[in-house]
C-alpha cells in the first residue's frame, strides 16, 4: 500500500488473498480486508503518498477518485486542497477510519463501500483517478474499467512498488502475474491517451506497513480524447 493507506481494491500493499483455480489472486472480499485492518489500530502511516502530492500539485482541483482508499490519507489530503473526492474500499473497517480522519480536519469525502469492479461510478466522471499499490485481478478487466472513469483531459495516476519479490508474494498468497502491473497499465491504454512511465521514483515513508518499499513505479496518463 503506501506512505499512507494501502490501496488494495485495487489500494495502496498486499495482504489477504484467495486461491483461484488457476493460482492465486487478491479479490475485493470485505471479510478478508476487515480482518487485515482489524489486526492493528492503524495499518498505514497516515500520510499521503508522495507521488500523489507531486502529481496533484500540477493539476487544478476537480473531481477525484481514490481507488482502494484504505484508511483515507490520500482522499483526505485531496479534499483539504479543494478536490471533490470520491473514495472507495471494500473494507468497512478501513472506511470507518477514513471517515474519522476526514471528520478530524472537517473535510467532506464521498465514501463508497465497494471494490472497483462492483462500485457504482460515473463513466468519465473524474478529472483524477488515483490508484496506489493496487491488487487488481486481470480477469476483471481493470484497465478498461479505470480508463472509463477518466474525463476527457483528466489524469489517471497508477503507482506500484518497483521491487516485487515473487517468492515472498507467493508465500503471502498472491501471484503478481495475475495482477495489473504498471507496465500493463501503460500498455493497455492505447490511442486517446498521453502516457508517461512507468517511471521509477524514490519514496520516503515514515512508518506503516509499506515502509520497507523504497521505490515506486509511476504511470501518469492523460486522456486526450472523449472516445
Residue ranges and their predicted role:
Residues 91-93:
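Conserved SAM/SAH-binding beta-strand->alpha-helix loop
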Residues 121-128:
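A short acidic, Gly/Pro-enriched loop at the edge of an enzyme's catalytic core
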Residues 141-152:
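A short glycine-rich, Lys/Arg-flanked "PGG" loop and its adjoining helix->strand segment in the class I
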Residues 98-99:
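Conserved SAM-binding loop
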Residues 2-59, 62-70:
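Conserved class I S-adenosyl-L-methionine
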Amino acid at each position: 500500500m503506501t506512505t499512507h493507506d494501502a490501496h488494495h481494491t485495487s489500494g495502496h500493499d498486499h495482504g489477504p488473498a484467495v486461491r483461484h483455480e488457476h493460482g492465486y489472486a487478491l479479490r475485493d472480499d470485505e471479510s478478508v480486508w476487515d480482518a487485515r485492518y482489524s489486526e492493528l489500530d492503524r495499518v498505514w502511516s497516515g500520510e499521503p503518498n508522495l507521488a500523489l502530492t507531486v502529481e496533484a500539485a500540477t493539476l487544478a482541483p476537480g473531481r477525484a477518485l481514490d481507488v482502494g482508499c484504505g484508511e483515507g490519507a490520500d482522499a483526505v489530503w485531496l479534499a483539504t486542497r479543494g478536490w471533490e473526492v470520491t473514495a472507495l474500499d471494500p473494507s468497512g473497517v478501513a472506511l470507518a477510519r477514513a471517515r474519522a480522519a476526514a471528520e478530524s480536519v472537517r473535510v467532506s469525502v464521498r465514501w463508497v463501500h465497494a471494490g472497483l469492479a462492483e462500485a457504482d461510478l460515473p463513466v468519465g466522471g473524474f478529472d483524477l483517478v488515483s490508484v496506489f499499490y493496487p491488487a487488481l485481478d486481470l480477469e476483471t478487466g481493470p484497465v478498461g474499467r479505470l480508463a472509463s472513469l477518466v474525463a476527457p483531459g483528466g489524469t489517471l495516476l497508477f503507482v506500484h512498488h518497483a521491487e516485487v519479490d515473487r517468492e515472498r508474494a507467493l508465500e503471502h498468497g498472491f501471484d503478481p502475474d495475475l495482477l495489473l502491473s504498471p507496465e500493463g497499465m501503460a500498455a493497455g491504454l492505447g490511442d486517446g491517451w498521453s502516457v508517461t512511465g512507468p517511471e521509477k521514483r524514490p519514496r520516503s515513508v515514515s512508518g506503516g506497513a509499506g515502509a520497507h518499499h523504497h521505490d515506486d513505479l509511476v504511470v501518469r496518463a492523460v486522456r486526450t480524447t472523449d472516445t
